[in-house]
């Protein structure tokens, strides 16, 4: 018999999953629609498509693990799931990093030659860095996952105790996240400095009146700030989710930590939708039509 708290956590997890499913689905459809309309992939559309696709996969992995985690305690399934999960998670982080670099390229305003050179070169240079680093990281992740995993012996149960070697295993698999996270923080910091500099100029010339560039700065920083907060929650909740599944498993703790984790791919999709005016207006129209239809057919 499920307790009230556990049932509430399951309900929250399902709601988050549905929100992310709709949000990421809307972003994928919008990206393809823009491609069909213009017959050309822009950098922004590719980033949004990759980000939404990775979040979509990450959501399903979390829900799959949450629903069937007892079956994944065997060495084979845990190993393969861990490798795929880490690759999808790191790909999602990389696309978010590219989004922050893209915002820097399009929005950042600096007059110094060094910053102008960095603005022109950093985006194209980071494309090659992403490709090379991601290929190396995929190979290392697969190699670590296939050779480092040593399941405990002498226990026929599917539940294995969480030992110290598994901390090192998880640490090595996630070691590829440090570089993109650093690039993300640097580019976000440059956006903050650019916003501060631009605000000082506008305050001196237009009595503090907000303009389109300042609004673009704030929209970008809101998106990046929400991503950073949700990603940190996801990273901090991951080890607790792993330890809560050890024998004997604590279902309440499992649902608490994985509900926090699923908020990362789900809620950030809404933040991205709110930052794209055309998608935001379309979603508002659809919601309004749904409300009107419900009122017409309701009692």
From Swiss-Prot:
It is found in: Membrane. Residues 1, 67-82, 149-175, 245-253 are extracellular. The chain crosses the membrane at residues 2-22, 46-66, 83-103, 128-148, 176-196, 224-244, 254-274. Residues 23-45, 104-127, 197-223, 275-299 are cytoplasmic. One of its GO terms (cellular component) is plasma membrane. It is a multi-pass membrane protein. The keyword Membrane applies. The keyword Translocase does not apply. InterPro entries: TAS2R. It comes from the Eukaryota. One of its GO terms (molecular function) is G protein-coupled receptor activity. Glycans are attached at residue 155. Keywords: G-protein coupled receptor, Glycoprotein, Membrane, Receptor, Sensory transduction, Taste, Transducer, Transmembrane, Transmembrane helix. Belongs to the G-protein coupled receptor T2R family. Receptor that may play a role in the perception of bitterness and is gustducin-linked. May play a role in sensing the chemical composition of the gastrointestinal content. The activity of this receptor may stimulate alpha gustducin, mediate PLC-beta-2 activation and lead to the gating of TRPM5. Most taste cells may be activated by a limited number of bitter compounds; individual taste cells can discriminate among bitter stimuli. This is Taste receptor type 2 member 5. The lineage of its organism: Eukaryota, Metazoa, Chordata, Craniata, Vertebrata. The gene is TAS2R5.
């Amino acid at each position: 018999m499920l307790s009230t708290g556990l049932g509430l956590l399951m309900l929250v997890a399902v709601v988050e999953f549905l929100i992310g499913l709709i949000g990421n689905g809307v972003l994928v459809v919008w990206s393809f629609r823009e491609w069909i309309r213009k017959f050309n992939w822009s950098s922004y559309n590719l980033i949004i498509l990759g980000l939404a696709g990775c979040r979509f996969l990450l959501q399903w992995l979390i829900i799959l693990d949450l629903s069937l985690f007892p079956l994944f305690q065997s060495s084979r399934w845990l190993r393969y799931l861990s490798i795929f999960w880490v690759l999808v998670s790191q790909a999602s982080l990389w696309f978010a990093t590219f989004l922050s670099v893209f915002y820097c390229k399009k929005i950042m305003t600096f007059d110094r030659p060094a910053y102008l050179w960095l603005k022109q070169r950093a985006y194209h240079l980071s494309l090659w860095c992403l490709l090379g680093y991601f290929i190396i990281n995929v190979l290392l992740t697969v190699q670590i996952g296939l050779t480092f995993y040593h399941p405990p012996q002498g226990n026929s149960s599917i539940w294995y105790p969480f030992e110290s070697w598994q901390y090192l295993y998880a640490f090595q698999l996630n070691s590829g996240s440090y570089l993109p996270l650093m690039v993300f923080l640097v580019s976000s910091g440059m956006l903050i400095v650019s916003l501060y500099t631009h605000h000082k100029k506008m305050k001196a010339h237009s009595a503090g009146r907000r303009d389109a560039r300042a609004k673009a700065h704030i929209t970008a920083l809101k998106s990046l700030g929400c991503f950073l907060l949700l990603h940190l929650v996801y990273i901090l909740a991951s080890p607790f989710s792993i330890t809560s599944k050890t024998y004997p498993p604590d279902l309440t703790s499992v649902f608490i930590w994985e509900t926090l984790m699923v908020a990362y791919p789900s809620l950030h999709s809404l933040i991205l939708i709110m930052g794209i005016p055309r998608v935001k207006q379309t979603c508002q129209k659809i919601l309004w039509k749904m409300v009107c239809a419900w009122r017409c057919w309701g009692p």
